[in-house]
Amino acid sequence: MQVPKFFFFNLSMLIIGLTTVCKCKDCSKPPKTITVSQSGNANFKTVQSAIDSVPSGNSQWVHIQISPGVYREKVLIERDKPCIYLKGGGGGSTSIEWNDHGNAHFTATFNIKASNIVAKGIAFKNTYNTVDTGKVLQAVAARVHEDKIAFYDCEFIGVQDTLFDSYGRHYYKGCYIQGGVDFIFGSAQSMFEGSTLFFSMGLGPKVDGVFTASEREEDDNSGYVFKNCNITGTGGKAILGRSLNAYGRVIVANSVLSDVVRPEGWESLHHNVSKITFVEEGNAGPGANTWHRVPWTKHLSGSGLHQFLDMSYIDKEGWIANIPSL
């Protein structure tokens, strides 16, 4: 890897350990609406300026309606601006794009540091590796680093390290995530439901890739759950995931796996694999044959599997039900 991901992850976990666990209050309704349009026929012309207008310490839902267009800007939601709902016209018509690479903590096109954030119908793209750069480097489309964050019908497009699903509880519903190497990575506690993971290196020769890269502490509840998803791609083969330390956790269930999935399925960067939890249950498709998988994958059934597939895995207190219907 071009960037030593384990270093940044360990730094992240240290920072998290030194901060208070998020006790995020629910946001109040009804939402206030502000608009964004590049034509100027709106409250703001850029997404960032609309976010900047939200008062510090905000506790009421703010609906930011984004008109169709390609917004070439880097967008940051700071920690003191929770309760924001960004809504576009769909990934095919509303996109936020930037061209940057390097440290994943600071170079993402879309960077979330606040809790209670929702995005719907928006594409987030890092275009660095999709042009003739001559190299494939860490280039993050979105970094998600707080609690109670949801994405509906969104797209995340990149090549290496597309989605930095860093920390907190997250829900991805009906989303499309595209990349080539570790394109969903981090230490978050997240559920991906009815979503598509598409492997594509985007440039260069056909090479093998990695869908996920997971790292967690032994006592954390974190991990990635993929439920009713479509895992596919083109231009090579990819493993479902790799563990960056001794405790990675990824569950793939009731999903369709194409033949893009390599027979061994998984790998670990740590020599001790006994506490890694890589699980495949109830899947279909040519890539779902587990006969040649690495021997240390886990099998879960009944309540052991249900604890991860149930929404309570990421939502015990009902924060998703508090999201406005927009």
Q: Where do the PLM segments sit?
A:
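Sequence-level preference for short, compositionally simple segments enriched
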Residues: 2-7, 17-326
